[in-house]
Design a protein with these regions (language model features):
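Amphipathic alpha-helical packing segments from all-alpha helical-bundle domains
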Residues: 72-75, 122-147, 155-160, 167, ...
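Amphipathic C-terminal alpha-helical segment
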Residues: 102-105, 109, 141, 158-179, ...
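Short secondary-structure transition hinges
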Residues: 94, 101-140, 148, 156, ...
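Hydrophobic/aromatic residues within well-ordered alpha-helical segments
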Residues: 16, 59, 66, 70, ...
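Hydrophobic alpha-helical connector segments
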Residues: 65, 79-108, 149, 157-161, ...
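Helix-turn-helix
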Residues: 19, 23, 27-61, 65
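N-terminal intrinsically disordered/low-complexity leader segments
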Residues: 1-15, 201-213
């Protein structure tokens, strides 16, 4: 049987890094940051701890790498959802749905963004603010275009929608609401969001705005 060190020498660096991130994701989502140890991650990856430190200088570096991946993925899926249609009501449904799809993913990566146990760390705070701000910018651009509201007001509305999506998705994924089917939860929250945002007068814009549901 190959030793941990022998197995570690057989994998290209990029592939090894991806493997370590997968192992760390499993350990962090199971134990949380504070209870997880680099030994746990090395064991989960089937390597020695010195090999792990060749790729990541500390447990925090490893955690931040995973947080960056999760934040980037959430921004990406929301942006794709917003860009998937020109119909405003459908945009709301798609954007809200993106948050629910994110929290229902088997990878558990949403916990890095929504349930981090390192929110007191400045480097984590900056990343969490960035992901909310980036998503709000995407949504605010659509609101400003369609309603002619000033940029500051559009951004405030967008941040509010992000908060609605995030908190409701976190609640839905908890055991308290596990009985609500995913599609039903998405539609409920999208309808609430649309009934609010559709109350603002539209500019002379070609987009239709049928009420979802």
């Amino acid at each position: 049987m190959a030793t941990k060190l022998e197995r570690a020498t057989r994998m290209p660096r990029d592939q090894r890094r991806a493997q370590l991130l997968d192992a760390a994701n499993e350990v962090f989502t199971t134990k949380g940051y504070h209870a997880a140890a680099m030994d746990d991650i090395a064991d989960a990856a089937g390597i020695s701890k010195p090999v792990l430190y060749q790729h990541f200088g500390s447990k925090l570096d490893l955690y931040l790498a995973l947080l960056d991946i999760s934040c980037d993925r959430l921004v990406e899926v929301v942006e794709e959802a917003v860009d998937s249609t020109d119909v405003n009501a459908d945009r709301v449904v798609a954007a809200m749905g993106a948050f629910y799809d994110f929290v229902s993913s088997a990878s558990g990566e949403f916990r890095f963004v929504f349930e981090s146990d390192l929110t007191g760390d400045n480097s984590v705070q900056k990343r969490l603010w960035r992901v909310n701000n980036d998503i709000a910018d995407i949504i605010a651009a659509v609101i400003a275009e369609d309603t002619a509201l000033p940029a500051e007001q559009s951004k405030l509305l967008a941040i509010s929608l992000v908060g609605l999506a995030q908190v409701s998705a976190r609640y839905w994924v908890s055991a308290d609401s596990a009985h609500i089917p995913l599609a039903d939860a998405q539609q409920l929250v999208a309808t609430l969001a649309w009934r609010g945002i559709s109350g603002f007068p539209l500019t002379d814009h070609p987009h239709a705005e049928p009420r979802p549901g």
